Design a protein with these regions (language model features):
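C-terminal and inter-domain tail/linker signature
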Residues: 1-133
Length: 133
């Protein structure tokens, strides 16, 4: 087994998210998520099947965009946006994942509705350089 590095882990996780959430290629996504995947999110059913089932049943227009990824050993944190959810607002999400034996093995998240300029107390966008329209 090759030694993992932060850069390799980042590329692995970004490819996994692209494969599942944007391409919706569930066969290929199975190569990234452990069969024993542990889910801590209150929004996602347990296990790999729970996650894949949620994505399968979600809106076809759902899209994931990443703006930041950080790695420390086998733990990674991503800051991203899910749009096209069929909800009044996009979701701004911080995902924390753990890699084990070459698979995504565990997941936690924090989810917040993306707000407009008018609703932002800070006056700063939550994702990227611009507020949603």
């Amino acid at each position: 087994m090759r030694e993992s590095t932060p850069q390799r882990n980042k590329a692995f996780v970004l490819e996994a998210f692209e494969t599942l959430f944007n391409k919706k290629d569930f066969v290929a996504a199975g190569k990234f998520w452990s069969p024993n995947y542990i889910q801590h999110s209150a929004h996602i059913p347990p296990g790999r099947e729970g996650l894949f089932g949620l994505v399968k049943s979600g809106p076809r227009g759902m899209k994931y965009e990443n703006s930041l990824i950080m790695a420390e050993g086998d733990m990674l944190m991503l800051h991203g946006r899910f749009s096209g959810l069929g909800l009044p607002a996009n979701w701004i999400v911080v995902d924390i994942v753990r890699i084990e034996n070459g698979f995504l093995a565990e997941h936690w998240d924090v989810i917040e509705d993306e707000v407009t300029r008018e609703k932002s107390a800070s006056g700063q966008p939550m994702f990227g350089e611009a507020f949603p329209s």
